[in-house]
């Protein structure tokens, strides 16, 4: 179906939604900025993880599972990591402390992503494994007049690129310096940003033509995307907060180093996330990690399944701001509870679900179509294959519900009690037991034993309110 389905994607670069035409349909390439591994991922970080996982699934559906390359980096060199290492492991040499921080944080991130139902990206490069590529790009930028050395740093000269500010639509004269760069006298322009900086003796560093040092924030992604996807690739994604300065500076570095008209053809950004109507922050007391949500009772007094968090995120279009709340999680859980548990996703995905997703990842419409299909599948098992394949596109797949043994025994007892009531023709009380169990998500099925002809009753969990 690859030649038949056309995706429409909103491109931040052009501020338009247009047909997506990959450079090479046999190798569609997407890069998404991954975590800086100094702290555990919070629910705001979960949004791009989930959104671009859905896009990855959709691209694989349209172009084939072997024809999509998805790169999501791990930033494991950063001053925030250094600070966290000094705080958490004061008795260790800094490099060893840094390794402890990055390894534990990366491991937790990958566990979180898996519990949110995300596929592994094709490649997950670490910044520390790509330092030579960064140095090479910086050397090229200096040689081409786009970068300069000053007081132990190598800086990008923003005035050297006529189209700087194109992504964020900022005029260079109006711009403030980048988020991680202080305005200092040694800069030619206030907006010039660091490509390389010298490291003190105790700090992590790599040998370079400019002395032992470490890379700036932005050069890392230019090097890793270029290495794994090429000088120009199809899609670059991330949160809306990365448009400036990070993505703007990535574009400047890559285009000026490679002499290309674009870095990526399509730039996609997911919207901001608030918690219960307020900006999420530690000072507000509403800072929630993915781990906290899934494994503790810090939010709403209970643990939440990963598929509930995932569906709650997808119930808002990815470009819209999202207000994350207990109510939203409850709504997502209620919706999931009405969907059939299924096995293999061997059917054909529902055209209405595919059509919604190919319209700039309209997950809201896709969920509505999936819910309609769920109702059909509940009534007629022939629709289960289509439901399973469609749910797999969203990565939201209802799980089998495991009940405590005590609950199972209690339900079995109620079923036996009902059978006795039916034998004595006490239908009203028997119907009352059926209704009580159904209200808890337990559906009874009456039949006959083929050998004895006696009435038998089986039950199954249809909803998650048990």
Swiss-Prot record:
Entry's Gene Ontology cellular component terms? cytosol
Q: What is the lineage of its organism?
A: Bacteria, Pseudomonadati, Pseudomonadota, Alphaproteobacteria, Hyphomicrobiales
Q: What is this protein called?
A: Cysteine--tRNA ligase
The EC number(s) attached to this protein equal 6.1.1.16
Q: Is the keyword Phosphoprotein in the record?
A: no
Swiss-Prot/TrEMBL keywords? Aminoacyl-tRNA synthetase, ATP-binding, Cytoplasm, Ligase, Metal-binding, Nucleotide-binding, Protein biosynthesis, Zinc
The domain of life is Bacteria
List the gene name: cysS
Subunit details: Monomer.
What GO MF annotations does this protein's record show? Answer: ATP binding; cysteine-tRNA ligase activity; zinc ion binding
């Amino acid at each position: 179906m690859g030649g038949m389905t056309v995706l429409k994607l909103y491109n931040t670069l052009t501020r338009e939604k247009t047909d997506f035409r990959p450079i090479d349909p046999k190798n569609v390439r997407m890069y998404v900025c991954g975590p800086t591994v100094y702290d555990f991922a919070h629910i705001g970080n979960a949004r791009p993880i989930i959104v671009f996982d859905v896009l990855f699934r959709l691209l694989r559906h349209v172009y084939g599972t072997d024809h999509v390359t998805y790169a999501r980096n791990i930033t494991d060199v950063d001053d925030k990591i250094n600070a966290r290492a000094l705080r958490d492991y004061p008795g260790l040499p800094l490099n060893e402390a840094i390794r402890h921080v990055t390894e534990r944080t990366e491991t937790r991130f990958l566990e979180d992503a898996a519990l949110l139902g995300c596929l592994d990206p094709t490649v997950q490069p670490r910044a520390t494994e790509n330092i030579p590529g960064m140095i090479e790009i910086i050397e090229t930028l200096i040689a081409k007049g786009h970068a300069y050395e000053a007081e132990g740093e190598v800086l990008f000269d923003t005035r050297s690129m006529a189209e700087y500010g194109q992504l964020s639509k900022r005029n260079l004269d109006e711009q403030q310096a980048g988020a991680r760069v202080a305005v200092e006298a040694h800069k030619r322009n206030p907006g010039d940003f660091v490509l390389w900086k010298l490291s003190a003796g105790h700090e992590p560093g790599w040998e370079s033509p400019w002395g032992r040092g470490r890379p700036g924030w932005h050069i890392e992604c230019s090097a890793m995307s270029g290495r794994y996807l090429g000088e120009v690739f199809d899609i670059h994604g991330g949160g809306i907060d990365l448009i400036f300065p990070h993505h703007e500076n990535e574009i400047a570095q890559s285009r000026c180093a490679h002499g290309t008209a674009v870095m990526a053809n399509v730039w996609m950004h997911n919207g901001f996330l608030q918690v219960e109507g307020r900006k999420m922050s530690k000072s507000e007391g509403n800072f929630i990690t993915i781990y906290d949500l899934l494994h503790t009772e810090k939010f709403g007094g209970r643990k939440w399944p990963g598929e509930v968090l995932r569906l709650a995120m997808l119930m808002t279009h990815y470009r819209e701001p999202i207000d994350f709340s207990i109510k939203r999680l409850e709504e997502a859980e209620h919706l999931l509870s009405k969907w059939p548990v299924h096995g293999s996703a061997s059917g054909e995905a529902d055209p209405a679900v595919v059509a919604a997703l190919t319209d700039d990842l309209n997950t809201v419409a896709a969920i509505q179509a999936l819910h309609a299909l769920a109702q059909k599948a509940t009534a007629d098992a022939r629709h289960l294959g289509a439901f399973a394949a469609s749910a797999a596109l969203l990565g939201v797949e209802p799980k089998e519900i495991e009940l405590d043994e005590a609950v199972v025994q209690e339900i079995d007892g109620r079923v036996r009690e009902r059978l006795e009531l039916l034998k004595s023709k006490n239908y009203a009380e028997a119907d009352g037991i059926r209704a009580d169990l159904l209200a808890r998500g337990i559906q009874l099925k009456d039949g006959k034993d083929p050998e004895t002809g006696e009435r038998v009753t089986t039950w199954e969990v249809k909803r998650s309110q048990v």
